[in-house]
Regions:
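N-terminal helix-turn-helix DNA-binding core of bacterial DNA-binding proteins
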Residues: 26, 44-86
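Pre-recognition alpha-helix immediately N-terminal to the DNA-recognition helix
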Residues: 30, 34, 45, 62-65, ...
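Residues within the DNA-recognition helix of helix-turn-helix
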Residues: 93-96, 158
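Charged, amphipathic alpha-helical coiled-coil/dimerization segments
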Residues: 95-153
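N-terminal leader segment of winged-helix/HTH proteins
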Residues: 1-54
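Short, locally clustered residues in the helix-turn-helix/winged-helix DNA-binding domain
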Residues: 36, 40, 65-71, 133, ...
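Exposed, interaction-prone assembly regions rather than primary DNA-binding/catalytic cores
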Residues: 150-166
């Protein structure tokens, strides 16, 4: 991924000057631009490598991790909520994981509500996920090593605060 050229604070002052933007507003714009850039870098370096190594997208990895963590069949709707995507998106992911040579998930009818599907991890899904977890964890850990432990904790607290109301 080519490195995105980020505007300087002076560039932002010039471009937002006509709006009578305060220094705090300009800093907010710069913050959002760097958060977007950080997200792009994480997606490429962490999830791009995961996809190249395993064929798993960020969404499929999240879905498999939820199933792995819960260790029992989960209603499709609950998976959607936990991943943060629509039921139709989750349904498409599940369908694609059912269509692999060795299906990564199993889909059964909920015995309590026949209109609902339950999704569970297959042995093939578990093997793929377990083989991916250590390299993925190491990539994430290596990426975060740029920051000290204290900086990481501060950033976590600030990001939680930033997203709490949204």
């Amino acid at each position: 991924m080519p490195k995105r050229l980020m505007p300087t604070r002076d560039n932002l002052r010039r471009s937002h000057g006509a709006l009578n933007a305060s220094e705090n507003d300009i800093a907010g714009v710069e913050l959002m631009l760097y958060l977007i850039r950080a997200s792009d870098v994480i997606r490429e370096e962490i999830y791009g490598a995961l996809r190249r190594d395993t064929g798993l997208t960020e969404g499929k990895f999240a879905l498999l991790m939820i199933l792995y963590d819960i260790s029992e069949p989960v209603p499709l709707v609950e998976l959607s909520v936990r991943i943060g995507v629509s039921s139709s998106t989750t349904s498409i992911m599940v369908t694609r994981m059912l269509q692999t040579e060795e299906p990564l998930v199993a889909k059964t009818v909920d015995p309590v509500d026949a209109r609902s599907a339950l999704i569970s991890l297959t042995p093939a899904g578990r093997r793929l996920l377990e083989s991916a977890m250590l390299p993925h964890f190491n990539r994430v850990s290596d990426f975060a090593k740029t920051l000290s432990s204290a900086e990481r904790e501060t950033m976590i607290a600030l990001l939680k605060k930033l997203v709490a109301g949204h």
